[in-house]
Swiss-Prot record:
Its EC number is 2.3.3.13. InterPro entries: 2-IPM_HCS-like, 2-isopropylmalate_synth_dimer, AIPM/Hcit_synth_CS, Aldolase_TIM, LeuA/HCS_post-cat, LeuA_allosteric_dom_sf, LeuA_bact_synth, PYR_CT. Residues 392-515 are annotated as: Regulatory domain. The lineage of its organism: Bacteria, Pseudomonadati, Pseudomonadota, Gammaproteobacteria, Vibrionales. Homodimer. Pfam families: HCS_D2, HMGL-like, LeuA_dimer. This is 2-isopropylmalate synthase. Its cofactor is Mn(2+). PANTHER family: 2-ISOPROPYLMALATE SYNTHASE 1, CHLOROPLASTIC-RELATED, HOMOCITRATE SYNTHASE-RELATED. Catalyzes the condensation of the acetyl group of acetyl-CoA with 3-methyl-2-oxobutanoate (2-ketoisovalerate) to form 3-carboxy-3-hydroxy-4-methylpentanoate (2-isopropylmalate). Keywords: Amino-acid biosynthesis, Branched-chain amino acid biosynthesis, Cytoplasm, Leucine biosynthesis, Manganese, Metal-binding, Transferase.
Length: 515
């Protein structure tokens, strides 16, 4: 049996199900590039049949990612599988992941089929997927609550049909480690063709057991672990891949396995996912939380000063947690910025150098010394902006007293510059009133967050909002050294997304009318 554990990331599919507002194709591609840098073996890019947006995301990621295998999910339905293959075909090699429910409650109450029918559907799905690729994964949904005899039968049939990865999900996070490890061990003992497939696990965190269950499965012989960055996902979330990575590294001698991950990319990847998904990381989160490497107890601090190994089982550097000052000023050239981006592992296709450099110069003029996290934040935010944004903030002035604030703005609306002033309960409220008046959009804010993206008083501030417009949710983000400006950028991000959606709807309607 191999001692390498394959890492299967489903942040862009299962993880996205936890978000209030869907990620854009650009945002998903950014995350995919980060996962590729991290060394993830398989990236589950989406569920193509679910929406045109998901189809386009999978297709785009399959086109651009070269060093990780791209996978798409499909039900055990012919059309699902065909659409998944169509989205993936631009990749040099790809995986189709098809699934069907196998637990008694799912088979009887959801599918309303006999178990014989379910086995036949699973077999046909695998055979259909094999027409497109020799890399097929089959999942037994709710395997954790499936009678073991039925599970063994389904696994054997799927392998005979051509599945070379068999996934055993604890879909509702019901099992505990000894129990789940026992399920995996039983499959190895009772399924005669088990040696022809890699056994994978996909554990949810409803009882807080997802990581522990995954490790128990690895000890029992599983050689693929599925999960998400920061453990994001439906309900209580998924198995946290950064925790799996550091467990397998820190306890490698005991467990006897390893991964191909570049663990020093963990912090950067975690931060990006948190930022784009607008999901803050709890401070005491293992591995990537703000307090993960903090020591406040006097006894602990004394021990750390004498020998870090007294209270530190891994180093901050092992996950890439380090801040290096850039020796760049506003007088530095593009080549210097590009050289530093290269040293951080970013490819030229991941950012526009001219845009990044222009933003860098503005920031350097404001705060002087620029750090890695500043440059990365500028890059990620620049990637969210579109050159064809209809609304652009040209000027902002704020006068604020103890109670009310007055804001004046100049907003570029297409080719026309418009001016507006408004009074509000604070500068952000006044700014938003100006923008509402000039754009005419009636938007309901569901969530508004401000977070620091650097250190010190002159650091960057990020504004994240979730807005509701005509029953649809939109996510907007803004970044600036001034939090009021960042707040305005976040709202304009939303309004430009709405404007583009309205334009597309109008074009579609005109086509229908013409026909």
């Amino acid at each position: 049996m191999s001692d390498q554990v394959i890492i299967f990331d489903t942040t862009l599919r299962d993880g996205e199900q936890a978000l209030s507002a869907s990620l854009t194709v650009k945002e998903k591609l950014q995350i995919a590039f980060a996962l590729e840098r991290l060394g993830v073996d398989v990236i589950e890019a989406g569920f193509p049949i679910s929406s045109p947006g998901d189809f386009e995301s999978v297709r785009t990621i399959a086109k651009h990612i070269k060093n990780s295998r791209i996978c798409a999910l499909s039900r055990a339905v012919t059309k699902d599988i065909d659409v998944a293959a169509d989205a993936l075909k631009v990749a040099e090699a790809f995986r189709i992941h098809t699934f069907i429910s196998t637990s008694t409650v799912h088979v009887q109450d959801k599918l309303r089929r006999s178990y014989d029918d379910v086995v036949e559907m699973g077999v046909k799905a695998v055979q259909r997927a094999r027409k497109y690729t020799d890399d097929v994964e089959f999942s037994c949904e709710d395997a954790g609550r499936t009678p073991i005899d039925n599970l063994c039968r389904m696994v054997e049939a799927a392998i005979n049909a051509g599945a070379n990865t068999i996934n055993i999900p604890d879909t509702v996070g019901y099992t505990i480690p000894g129990e789940f490890g026992g399920i995996i061990q039983t499959l190895f003992n009772r399924v005669p063709n088990i040696d022809k497939a890699i056994i994978s696990v996909h554990c949810h965190d409803d009882l807080g057991m997802s990581v522990a269950n995954s490790i128990a499965a690895v000890q029992a012989g599983a050689r693929q672990v599925e999960g998400t960055i920061n453990g994001i996902g439906e309900r209580a979330g998924n198995c946290s891949l950064e925790e799996i990575a550091m467990i397998l590294q820190t306890r490698s001698e005991y467990l006897g396995v390893h991964t191909s991950l570049k663990n020093d990319e963990i912090h950067r990847t975690s931060k990006l996912v948190s930022q784009l998904c607008n999901m803050p990381i709890q401070s005491n989160k293992a591995i990537v939380g703000a307090n993960a490497f903090s020591h406040s107890s006097g006894i602990h601090q004394d021990g750390m000063l004498k020998n870090k190994n007294t209270y530190e089982i891994m180093t901050p550097e092992s996950i890439g947690l380090k801040n290096k000052a850039l020796n760049l000023t506003s007088r530095s050239g593009r080549a210097a910025v590009k050289s530093h981006m290269d040293s951080m592992g970013y490819k030229a296709e991941e950012y526009n150098l001219d845009t990044l450099y222009a933003d860098f110069v503005k920031l350097a003029d404001r705060k002087g010394q620029v750090f890695d996290y500043d440059l990365e934040a500028l890059m990620h935010f620049a990637n969210l902006r579109d050159e064809d944004d209809f609304y652009k903030l040209n000027y902002l002035s704020v006068q604020s007293g103890s109670v009310m604030a007055t804001t004046s703005i100049k907003l570029l609306c297409g080719d026309e510059e418009k001016c507006e002033a408004a009074v509000g309960n604070g500068p952000v409220d006044a700014l938003y009133q100006c923008i509402y008046k000039l754009t005419g959009y009636e938007i309901v804010l569901d969530k508004f967050d401000l977070t620091a993206k650097g250190e010190g008083e002159d650091g960057l501030g990020q504004a994240d909002i979730i807005a509701n417009y005509k029953g649809r949710k939109y996510h907007g983000t803004g970044l600036a050294t001034d939090i009021i400006e960042a707040s305005g950028q976040a709202l304009l991000h939303v309004i430009n997304s709405i404007h583009r959606a309205d334009q597309i709807a109008e074009i579609k309607q005109n086509k229908i009318t013409t026909v």
